[in-house]
Amino acid sequence: MNMKRIAFLFLCLFGLLSIGHCQEKQSFDHYYLTIKAIKEGNISDFEKNIKHIKNIDSLFHTDTDHSYTMLGYACLYQNKHIVQRLIRMKANMECVYSDDMYCYDALYMAVDKGNAELVKLFLSLGANANVAYNEDGLCPLVMSCSMNSYPVTCLLLQYGAKANGLDNLGGDYITYPLMVAVDKNNINMVKILLKYGAKTKVRDKSGKSPIFVARRHKNVEIIKLLEKSR
């Protein structure tokens, strides 16, 4: 009798574990299918699967070391329609992507992709144009300058990004947008940064100034522009 009871309990436990495994697999399938729909721009499949995801803000990874929320995947694949749909679903914009060290917001991903439409959307919804992504001064404006994206740089400045960056945040380096723009030899970006008040006399922790970088590149136009703005 005891052996029968033990066997019965074992079968019940096995059944519960099997159900749990099936539910977990089904949950994974809905995540995978939703991500696939986002990537392919399949709105019908997106709507069909997203309703089965309990927490759209949970970070989920497939075959990479990085993890994304549903909004993060929508930004990754630059699907504006689904981005807007997820925002209507109250998706969190402050943590949509994570690597081994940091968690990044939706604005980070939009700037990283150089997608001016998404950048404008997130800024209009209150995203912080001066958010710090690390202790070395990485911020949206530094990113846009690094990517040579003039339209995104203009948008960030229009929405209050500090033309001088975030200054010293206690890291090993200080990153100034103007230094980056000069290093990229992008005269239009240099002009817009100066227009919004970027200082020409800043120096990084190695002592280099914007004009030093311009001279190293032998960019006469930028050298003249910086000298005139002193």
Q: For each predicted feature, which ranges?
A:
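Bacterial N-terminal signal peptides
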Residues: 9-16
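Conserved ankyrin/ankyrin-like repeat signature
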Residues: 45, 81-82, 117-118, 151-152, ...
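N-terminal leader/linker segments that initiate helical-solenoid repeat arrays
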Residues: 22-51, 58
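Ankyrin repeat domain, specifically the short helix-to-loop turn at the C-terminus of the second helix
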Residues: 50-57, 84-93, 120-128, 154-163, ...
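Ankyrin-repeat-protein effector appendages
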Residues: 22-34, 159, 196, 205, ...
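Ankyrin-repeat boundary/"N-cap" motif
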Residues: 27-36, 59-72, 96-107, 132-141, ...
